Amino acid sequence: MSRPGHGGLMPVNGLGFPPQNVARVVVWEWLNEHSRWRPYTATVCHHIENVLKEDARGSVVLGQVDAQLVPYIIDLQSMHQFRQDTGTMRPVRRNFYDPSSAPGKGIVWEWENDGGAWTAYDMDICITIQNAYEKQHPWLDLSSLGFCYLIYFNSMSQMNRQTRRRRRLRRRLDLAYPLTVGSIPKSQSWPVGASSGQPCSCQQCLLVNSTRAASNAILASQRRKAPPAPPLPPPPPPGGPPGALAVRPSATFTGAALWAAPAAGPAEPAPPPGAPPRSPGAPGGARTPGQNNLNRPGPQRTTSVSARASIPPGVPALPVKNLNGTGPVHPALAGMTGILLCAAGLPVCLTRAPKPILHPPPVSKSDVKPVPGVPGVCRKTKKKHLKKSKNPEDVVRRYMQKVKNPPDEDCTICMERLVTASGYEGVLRHKGVRPELVGRLGRCGHMYHLLCLVAMYSNGNKDGSLQCPTCKAIYGEKTGTQPPGKMEFHLIPHSLPGFPDTQTIRIVYDIPTGIQGPEHPNPGKKFTARGFPRHCYLPNNEKGRKVLRLLITAWERRLIFTIGTSNTTGESDTVVWNEIHHKTEFGSNLTGHGYPDASYLDNVLAELTAQGVSEAAAKA
């Protein structure tokens, strides 16, 4: 989010470009599955910039500078990051910041997660923290950025304003991000084919740009009347709220100052910075019965009913959320006008959004029925039995046809020409695979060095399947690294929103904690399983039952979950979803994980197909 003065995003002209001949720091970012832009490290950004100078439409092999990013490639022409072993594609972007800001100085702010690992804040939040640190503010309130956290510089800690839990904070010096001067060709900032006359108008960019504008307005307003810094709040009493972070079901927009006083009591929980985005909200002060949780200066808060009755003529009543989730405006944008008007000192009455309905009414055992056309009500997966590993060369040769006279094109894995030796020559040696050999994949026809495909396969799950890095076509049966667990499914006599005359398929996933196997990130180390059993819902119609059958197949292939780092809590070595989205909100769609959602069934079928799970693949 841009900030007044130094440290914010560089100003742009009408076409969305930085002004010419102005120095700025370049930060490359990728969009995670929760629509948060996460920055690459400075080292990776320098590497991307170097490749960009040579070929603005080329590809960047991230593993050349970071061993943890070996599977990843960035295609500069389409502005997407591609993961070779899973086929996952994510948008990337190139952002510009003032050279005097945190990335320009190589300053990184991080918070400590439950596993003791350090997680970097999003770049906009990092810049805000650094600005406050440089101005010698004793503390910083992140409410205006959508997070109910207080940063205390004296103790270098972050405190949750509801649970009072503290986490350690650190400021680390790293390599400064790359500096650039001059105008930027459009192909470096947007995918080829983007509109040439206007900046991007997708919902995500609208949300980001509006949030930046709102933050500027809030800060400008509060600079005129900065409140005194309060004392540190008392430590939480013994036996207080647990430290686990709860997902915030709804958020309240606020015009509170960035330096506003800490709340006197607990409010609703919100995720830590860097967690999945929800509607930006700020926690309120001590909540009392019948009061709306609006943490902003002004008239005394009243109940929503009396507030509506007392709204004077001409004062807009703005919902905190787009409650129905309909229309061209993203739900998170529905209250943005309220923030801007409130920051400008105009009268605004905000109404509270309802809480999501996560679960159906209680159902007796006699009302639970099997799903028609789907045998059984349960599937279990056990610990993966270690089989003799398939020889990587044999797997690659099974799906490849040798090419005697390859074209003078790039191999998109190593970025060397196909007419020359593989970039893995001297790095990887496999008996019988010469570095100059080139092959063509049978179905899709894309060509690569055989040694490059062997390297890609060896870096993946090594399950006997191969995935084309270009078109994501899967050869063989792809399997995952899901831990052992149980999947149950049955009918319940309740309807989902949007399916009034249809019963509901309920899926219950349950995975216990355990020890990681050789296919997991840290073999021999314990992994956690938070939030289980997890309940998910489908309509009991033809397409819903089709999705269920394919989800069962995906479960048996261990593709539904994996072990990694939670984007919600930052916890590492924990069970997380694996690119196949589920609906976990039964009676509403306030979190984006519920109904009505007319495109969900088609979207999840496409996600399953991308994992190699489809009816066509089953018949093949």
Curated annotation (Swiss-Prot):
Keywords of this entry: Cytoplasm, Metal-binding, Notch signaling pathway, Nucleus, Repeat, SH3-binding, Transferase, Ubl conjugation, Zinc, Zinc-finger
Family the entry assigns: Belongs to the Deltex family.
Natural source organism: Homo sapiens (Human)
Subunit structure: Homodimer. May form a heterodimer with other members of the Deltex family. Interacts with NOTCH1 via its N-terminal region and EIF3F, the interaction is required for NOTCH1 deubiquitination. Interacts with EP300. Forms a heterodimer with BBAP; the heterodimerization leading to an increase of in vitro ubiquitin ligase activity. Interacts with ITCH.
Identification of the protein by name: E3 ubiquitin-protein ligase DTX1
Comment field on protein domains: The WWE domains are thought to mediate some protein-protein interaction, and are frequently found in ubiquitin ligases.
EC number of this enzyme: 2.3.2.27
Motif SH3-binding positions after renumbering to this chain: 230-233
A UniProt-annotated Pfam family: DTC
Post-translational modification: Ubiquitinated; undergoes 'Lys-29'-linked polyubiquitination catalyzed by ITCH.
PROSITE patterns for this protein: WWE, ZF_RING_2
GO cellular component: cytoplasm; cytosol; nuclear body; nucleoplasm
Pathway(s) served: Protein modification; protein ubiquitination
GO molecular function, one term: transcription coactivator activity
Chain's role: Functions as a ubiquitin ligase protein in vivo, mediating ubiquitination and promoting degradation of MEKK1, suggesting that it may regulate the Notch pathway via some ubiquitin ligase activity. Regulator of Notch signaling, a signaling pathway involved in cell-cell communications that regulates a broad spectrum of cell-fate determinations. Mainly acts as a positive regulator of Notch, but it also acts as a negative regulator, depending on the developmental and cell context. Mediates the antineural activity of Notch, possibly by inhibiting the transcriptional activation mediated by MATCH1.
Zinc finger (RING-type): 411-472
InterPro entries, A to Z: Deltex_C, Deltex_C_sf, Deltex_fam, WWE-dom_subgr, WWE_dom, WWE_dom_sf, Znf_RING, Znf_RING/FYVE/PHD
Induction and repression of expression: Regulated by NOTCH2.
